[in-house]
């Protein structure tokens, strides 16, 4: 390997340097404190584990995004986590096994074999929160509110939210008796708003069902979409009408809490269709082609771990929030330069200063005093009259 290649990083993999790394870490601590104040408990999951665990349930969508390796000890296939949700679901279902609702949160690096979108990171710092054990819209509203509080904490400007419900399409597709292949084709066409394709795929269905499936292409816009949907989907199965009721209840609560938040409804939005079961939501900002925070309901996610539980949650990339956010992060500046000395009194003084939160940098043998400036020190420890004192560096 040529020397010039040794410092190159793979596409989508980046290192974070000072002071940006400090900003990210401070933001991480602030967000975790926010989660804790809402009653969410932190969990730490393995970076790597057996592949079948990572790709169980919600993880099936992650297959193409998961780096895979062979465990040299067992010979089994392992994967680096590409998302926390399957791991947290296992913790709730198999390890904690609580009877009541469980609120869990996480923050850590994930690794993607394929980027989420063009020019996006393959090593985001994912943070999120998940609420297990309650199937009501109240839990969805809580999780969405916590997501918005996270964006407010980092002061991300000009956010707007998209809301949908995969139960609407799923209920109509089930009533139409679509084969798996046709259901997937129609799903793809709806995501692209491909009207002609949707028309062709639903042409042979009973009139009412065909009309309702075709209506999903057009049922997008402001709050008036929900009233329109009640009319155009009025002959839909009960599960579809219940999904509309849930979506309306969530929208009402959000409008009450956040009257200035723009809400956009898209009943053909099926993000995460393979594992989401209810409401889905995402936050966008101008200039970003991808959502900056997203989530939804994924009931029964723990079934593959032996215990099905309703669940809802959200996730976001901390590095993106720090980049987009306007919140002022106050970084520690300055420090005290400690001379290279074996004096026990000096060491005791340094320990006391550090315990008080002061930053003290040890001078190494041969370093001139000018090195203190490079170490961002503005003061120094000097022995005067038999005592070590902190004085300005210029003195």
Curated annotation (Swiss-Prot):
Its GO biological process terms? Answer: L-histidine biosynthetic process
Keyword annotations for this protein, in alphabetical order, are:
Amino-acid biosynthesis, Cytoplasm, Histidine biosynthesis
Q: Does the keyword Cell inner membrane apply?
A: no
The answer to whether the entry has keyword Cell inner membrane is: no
**What pathway is this protein a component of?**
Amino-acid biosynthesis; L-histidine biosynthesis; L-histidine from 5-phospho-alpha-D-ribose 1-diphosphate: step 1/9
- Tell me which GO cellular component terms the UniProt record holds: cytoplasm
HAMAP family membership: HisZ
More info: This function is generally fulfilled by the C-terminal part of HisG, which is missing in some bacteria such as this one.
This one is known as ATP phosphoribosyltransferase regulatory subunit
Q: Which gene encodes it?
A: hisZ
